């Protein structure tokens, strides 16, 4: 019987082999990276467009442009897209971050012809229907109002605004009225500027076959797609950090308190970034980290405390997050 009082030996990894992707330049100039690793007949396709919060002209423009891609195209409405993806056992993920928008498809290899047809329509010919947009905006407003009563949400907003300043895209806080300013025309403007072949890169992973690469090249790599083929210019933003070191956001009706501690830190391009990621993981990035073992296991102050690096462009944020009984922990 296993004696759980005996701690397992700590062993150093003997060898860590990281497979390198194959880099291909498609005929229309789109870079394609292929990581052929996997035994199951499944492929993941990622299309990245260099257009996120740092490039938008108004708050939420990048987010809703990406979010609305699946809500209707010239060939399929939202119900047809959802039904077809479900029928073929595929999964579509849409997300928007600081610098990039992501369109991700998981598909069984045997149904790639059908699922890639849907993916092509979503990327190349969205229509941003007004009715569906109105429903999604209303739902997001309700979620925003719910979140606005949560102490961890308010603490995070207070931290990034204090570190970056209200005019920096990292510290510019979304308000309820920003949702109401989103229209199909606003989304179409952002789509035309950033969703095109000269601003796109593609990544394939899983059990990638030659047929899959051929189909990707046929749909996204032979001819240019989009309307505005200018490469987006990178705009540099400079943080304006507040002089105050302690900021209090009062919520008299709140049942909990949240603490966020943070400082401007490294971005992904810094030579010490990966070392810092490992260090912060040991400090507070997983269940057995130092923060968790000290604050939760030893002192019993909370169920959860964590630390992380948020790698925003230019300067990231090193943050420690905690929500529960504030006074004893401090």
Residue ranges and their predicted role:
Residues 326-330:
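A short, hydrophobic C-terminal helix/tail in secreted or cell-surface proteins
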Residues 1-6, 25, 36, 80-231, ...:
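Charge-rich, well-structured scaffold segments of protease-associated domains
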